[in-house]
A protein has these predicted regions:
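A short, N-terminal "cap"/entry segment at the start of jelly-roll beta-barrel domains
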Residues: 1-76, 83-85, 155-230, 241, ...
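Non-catalytic C-terminal interaction regions
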Residues: 3, 64-65, 277-278, 286-329
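Polyanion-binding and phosphate-handling cores
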Residues: 55-58, 63-76, 82-85, 91-92, ...
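A generic fold-level signal
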Residues: 67-71, 90, 133, 224-226, ...
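Short, conserved beta-strand element in jelly-roll/cupin
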Residues: 78-79, 88-107, 141-143, 233-234, ...
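Short acidic-glycine-tyrosine-enriched beta hairpin
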Residues: 108-127, 264-281
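Ligand-binding loop in jelly-roll beta-barrel domains
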Residues: 124-155, 271-272, 280-309
Length: 329
């Protein structure tokens, strides 16, 4: 079967070029070499990391690192209650995507009440804390400054008290570098929590809450010269079309719906709560039989997995493709 592959680069939504491919050859191992020299490497299949979206109670634990290099860190966190300190980043903007539950973000730029599907960006140098109620969210630590590409749906506000039942008490503030990874605190000290939260009245800036446009296939939300972060909507129907990004790893988080990811590193069924990394230069397409969406992070630099693997992709077989008759981007 012939398919089209779009060759992409990080800074453009338009293909660098589009190529007609034989799908079987595209996904199959290469032909055996005709010389007695090893010409290419054996590469492992794609790996999936899964965290359940349904809240499961447990004692407070630090966020779980999922992917990380020396510039970017992707974490998954769940929270039921307060964090043990206020946090101020030295080097990164901190972007979150709300998976489920309720969460109050308290900061020097005001308070946000999150709903599932909300994105927000805490600018570098802004102190903040969270109060979760069976909450789960994904965190992206990205070198500042990050530019917002979508209009704000709402903004942080000067709310006091920040949530019902709040009482001022002993609080600490942690200053961190290296994307807030555990063990990279610079200094930790006591603060007057009420004084910290009242700083909002001295600030002109507010934090924007962004959401994906369900009417668009791709909603670009945040960008720098080295990353793009957005949301991709998948709908059944259409012809299968492949994408190969030449200069960026892609991290995908399956937010809603089920789909099958077909790649040159194997085929894997994805469900809500799955993370997967597609290395740069790997051709891939998605097949969906139900509506869904996923968060997409494109990173110009390799972004290795640091979490334990939940499962791996299956090797391509010609028998698998005939059942995959529905395409999604």
């Amino acid at each position: 079967m012939s398919v089209v592959e779009d060759v992409m680069v990080l800074g453009s939504d338009q293909p660098l070029r589009s190529i007609v491919r034989d799908e079987h050859l595209l996904l199959s191992p290469p032909h055996p070499p005709k010389v007695p020299v090893k010409l290419w490497e054996e590469h492992p299949p794609l790996t999936v990391v899964h965290y359940p979206q349904q809240y499961e109670s447990e004692a407070f634990a630090p966020p779980r690192g999922v992917y990380e290099n020396d510039e970017i860190r992707v974490e998954w966190q769940k929270l039921d209650g307060r964090q043990p300190f206020y946090h101020r980043n030295c080097d990164v903007d901190e972007i979150s995507y709300q998976i489920g539950g309720e969460r109050t973000l308290m900061s020097e730029l005001g308070v946000i009440e999150f709903q599932p599907g909300d994105f927000s960006r805490i600018p570098r140098g802004v102190a903040h804390d969270n109060y979760g109620r069976e909450d789960s969210h994904v965190l992206f630590y990205i070198p500042a400054p990050v530019t917002e590409l979508a209009p704000a749906q709402r903004e942080s506000g000067a709310v006091f008290p920040p949530f019902p039942g709040w009482q001022p008490g002993e609080a600490n503030e942690a200053i961190t570098q290296c994307m807030a990874a555990l063990g990279h605190d610079i200094t930790v000290f006591g603060v007057d929590e009420q004084l910290l939260l009242e700083q909002v009245h001295q600030e002109d800036r507010r934090m924007a809450v962004l959401r994906a446009d369900p009417g668009q296939d791709v909603t670009r939300l945040y960008t720098t010269d080295r990353i793009r972060l957005g949301m991709v909507t998948t709908t059944p129907g259409g012809q299968r079309r492949y994408r190969r990004t030449l200069d960026a790893d892609e991290i995908q988080y399956q937010a809603h719906g089920h789909r099958t990811l077909i790649t040159q590193r194997g085929i894997v069924d994805l469900e809500p709560g799955d993370f997967v990394r597609i290395p740069l230069g790997i051709s891939h397409a998605s097949v969906a039989t139900e509506p869904g969406d996923y968060v997409s992070l494109l990173s110009h630099r390799e972004l290795p997995q640091v979490a334990e693997t939940t499962r791996t992709a299956d090797a391509y077989t010609p028998e698998r493709l005939p059942s995959l008759t529905v395409e999604a981007r």
